[in-house]
Curated annotation (Swiss-Prot):
Biased composition (Acidic residues): 199-210
Record bears the keyword Transmembrane helix: no
Annotated keywords: Ribonucleoprotein, Ribosomal protein, RNA-binding, rRNA-binding
Gene field: rplY
InterPro entries documented for this protein: Rbsml_bL25/Gln-tRNA_synth_N, Ribosomal_bL25/Gln-tRNA_synth, Ribosomal_bL25_b-dom, Ribosomal_bL25_C, Ribosomal_bL25_long, Ribosomal_bL25_short, Ribosomal_L25_dom, Ribosomal_uL5_bac-type
NCBIfam families membership: bL25_bact_ctc, PRK05618.1-2, PRK05618.1-5, PRK05943.1
Region (Disordered): 191-210
Protein family membership: Belongs to the bacterial ribosomal protein bL25 family. CTC subfamily.
GO molecular function: 5S rRNA binding; structural constituent of ribosome
GO biological process: translation
Gene Ontology cellular component annotations, sorted alphabetically: cytosolic large ribosomal subunit
The name this protein goes by in its record: Large ribosomal subunit protein bL25
Function (record text): This is one of the proteins that binds to the 5S RNA in the ribosome where it forms part of the central protuberance.
């Protein structure tokens, strides 16, 4: 994966308002904002197509990005993205500043691996994914692009919870930090495949005798 998807050029935007944003979009520019830390929020403009291409990669949403803001590097995380309801177009993007030495809080996707090696799945079980990402906190340098959920040893009827996951060093689950069972969320369950509806032979026989 090219590091280019994690580096974006941006410029400070002073022409604000809906009309200005519409003009930017007609020029294939993307309005956005950077906030967080002790600095004031900054409205910015980016190249829409470059951001749209980067947004096709899952890691774009769980990776510390570098915005070259008028030539000055600023480290950020994607916090929100507004898309057009039916066109392949991004309407607005929000970034949060990453502050050196401060923990970041963000969602990281889960990758379910080795399902094909699970005896339960081989026996016809179906893996029901309850969540596909979890909220974590860590130092920026420790932020993983994804967290693996190893399904190889999961048995039929078993539910994997947050507390069963192996998190990378320095990474903590926000939910588990609340220290009660209600926040030990179910991640995935392997369930038996639903049985086909059984024929009511007695009913059929009774109907044939009438």
């Amino acid at each position: 994966m090219s590091e280019a998807i994690f580096n974006l050029d941006a410029s400070v935007r002073t022409d604000l308002g809906k009309g200005a944003s519409r003009r930017l979009r007609r020029e294939d520019k993307l309005p956005g904002i950077i906030y967080g830390g002790e600095e004031a929020p900054v409205s910015i403009t980016l190249d829409h197509n470059k951001v749209n291409n980067s947004a096709d990669f899952e890691a774009f949403y769980s990776h510390v990005l570098t915005l070259n803001l008028d030539g000055k590097p600023v480290e950020v995380l994607v916090k929100d993205m507004q898309r057009h309801p039916y066109k392949p177009k991004i309407m607005h993007i929000d970034f949060q500043r990453v502050i050196a030495g401060e923990d970041v809080h963000t969602n990281v996707p889960l990758h379910f691996v080795n399902e094909e090696k699970s005896a339960a799945v081989k026996a016809g079980g179906i893996a029901e994914h309850h969540v596909t990402e979890i909220e974590v906190t860590c130092q920026p340098k420790d932020l993983p692009e994804f967290i693996e959920v190893d399904m190889a040893a999961v048995e039929m009827g078993q539910t994997v919870h947050l507390s069963d996951l192996t998190l990378p060093a320095g990474v903590s689950s926000v939910e588990l930090a609340k220290n009660d069972e209600a926040h030990d969320l179910a991640v995935v369950t392997v369930k038996p495949a639903p049985k086909a509806a059984e024929t009511d032979e007695d009913g059929e026989e009774a109907a044939s005798e009438e």
